Amino acid sequence: MNKVIIYYGSKEKFNRIIPKEYRNLTDLVYESDKDGKTMKLVIPNQNGDYPKEDKEEKIYVKNFVISSDEYAGVREHVITNFINFLAKFDVENLYIQNPPLQISEQILRLYPNADVKYQRYKRLTTSHLLKINEEYDNKIIGQEDVKLELLQALFPLTMKYRQKPVVLLFYGKSGIGKTETAKYIAKIIGEPIFRKQFSMYQNNQFATYLFGGAHYEKSFAKDLLDRKSNVLLLDEFDKAHPSFHSAFYQLFDEGIYEDQNYYLTLKKSII
C-alpha cells in the first residue's frame, strides 16, 4: 500500500484531505458480500481430474476512503477482522476517519508507519480575552461579577505548556445567561459550539452512550471525535444520574476520554 492516513477530526476537515474520486466502505462491503455469494460449477475432465482453479485477482482500488459514519452500517466481522477484509482488495491509498480501536490497532500493527493526523482546532488567545473583557457586560446582561472569574479561568489556555482542558461550571436559574455565555465564548474564538443535552437520555441509554456499546450504537466518545469545535457545552449536566459522573473524571482532569470502542484526548478544550 502506498499511503495510509488515519485522520481524527470532523467530517468537514476530513473531506479536505481526501481525493475527489474514491470508493467507500459501504461500496466495498457490498462488493465483497456479492462475490462471496457467487457459486462456481467445476466439472472434471475425461480423466476425472478437476482443473486447477485460477488464482482470483484482487479488485484494484486506487483510493479507499472510510468516513466515521460508515462503521454503523457494516457487520461486526468487518470491524473485528478489518485487515482480512482489506486483504481482499488491492488498495493503493487508504484514508480512514475516526476509526474504532479495533480497526486502528489492526492498521497500525500492519502499517506502523501510517500517517496519523489530528484536526487542529482554534485556540484561545490573549486577544480573545481582551475582547471578552470589553464586550461581555454588553452581551450577557446582569452578570458583571462573572466576567472576572471567567477571564481568570480561561487565562491558563493562553499558555503554551497548558494542554489540559479548562472546565467551567455555570449554574443558576434559567435565563441568567449560562448557555449564552458558552455560545459567546465559542463565537469569540470563531468556532461552532459542540452541544450535548444530557436531559434527553434515559439511564439505560446514557450508560451505553457514555461507556460504549455495539459499534453501530451512538457514543459520546465518537461524537467528541467527530466534533467541529473545541468549545464543548454539556447542557443540563445535573440531570444525569450521579452514578455517571465518574465517566467524566479523567476527561475533566486530564482531557482523556475512552470507552470500549474509542480513545481520545482533548487538548486546550473549553468544557
Provide a role label for each language-model segment:
Residues 142, 150, 179, 210, ...:
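Conserved RecA-like P-loop NTPase ATPase core
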Residues 2-29, 162-196:
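Walker A/P-loop
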Residues 126-167:
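Pre-Walker A (pre-P-loop) alpha-helix and adjacent loop at the N terminus of AAA/AAA+ ATPase modules
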Residues 56-58, 225-227, 259-271:
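AAA+/SF3 P-loop NTPase mechanochemical coupling elements
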Residues 89-90, 163-164, 189, 204, ...:
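Short loop/turn elements that form and flank the Walker-type P-loop nucleotide-binding site
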Residues 1-119:
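N-terminal accessory segments that target, anchor, or regulate ATP-driven/P-loop NTPase machines
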Residues 53, 65-79, 226-253, 270:
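Conserved AAA+/SF3 P-loop NTPase catalytic/coupling segment centered on the Walker-B
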Residues 188-216:
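AAA+/P-loop NTPase substrate/partner-engagement loops
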